[in-house]
Amino acid sequence: YKLLMEDNLLVTTFLIDKMLQWGTPNDLEIYNSWSRYFNNLTIKQERVFNPKNTTLILPMAGKGSRFEDEGYVLPKPMLDIDGKPIIIQSVDCLQKSDNNIFICLGEHIKNFGIDGTLEQTYKNCNVISLDETTEGQACTCKIGVEEGGVDLESPVLISACDNGVYYDSEKYLKLLNDENVDVIVW
């Protein structure tokens, strides 16, 4: 951004209180190292429930090739973060939802039982199996909307399977319940 400022372009920053990134093998290794150091430091916040029939759509149908290339056997969503799979840590950072739609690769379901892990952990869990990867997360989410029977007149929360967020739940619910707000991006 410094180069943009040198060109006299307007640069605005939005500060995020806390964010954890587990998207690459190096990210995961660094996080686990610091986590052990700080005695299992993970995001601890009350999971807020929004009574507006919210659906969570969570794409996790990638190959995880960066991890595979580093010798990891488990798919990225099943890798351990403080005793829980990454996918569970990621979802537990979010508001509670009435409907949870997870889009996974069929091979991860067959070989690693990712569907069982999700179904044991979350109520109203719909695991959609894909035979192959898509062109990206947006395409995967579209499949989740279509095959999951998502009510697009109710709130939909789309998140990733490999990060955690810490947010002000009161402000979030205020935005979510504001009739003038159509989309919240964070």
Model-found features: residue ranges?
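The conserved beta1-alpha1 loop
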Residues: 61
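Short alpha-helical oligomerization interface
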Residues: 72-77
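The conserved acidic donor/metal-binding loop of glycosyltransferases
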Residues: 160-164
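Conserved donor-nucleotide/metal-binding helix-loop-beta segment in metal-dependent transferases, i.e.
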Residues: 166-186
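Conserved beta-strand scaffold positions in the cores of enzyme catalytic domains, especially
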Residues: 11-13, 19, 78, 127, ...
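Conserved N-terminal catalytic core of the sugar/cofactor nucleotidyltransferase
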Residues: 41-58, 66-68, 80, 84-158, ...
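Short, high-confidence coil segments that cap the C-terminus of an alpha-helix
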Residues: 9, 97-98, 153, 179-183
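Conserved alpha/beta core of the MobA/IspD/sugar-nucleotide pyrophosphorylase nucleotidyltransferase superfamily
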Residues: 1-56, 152
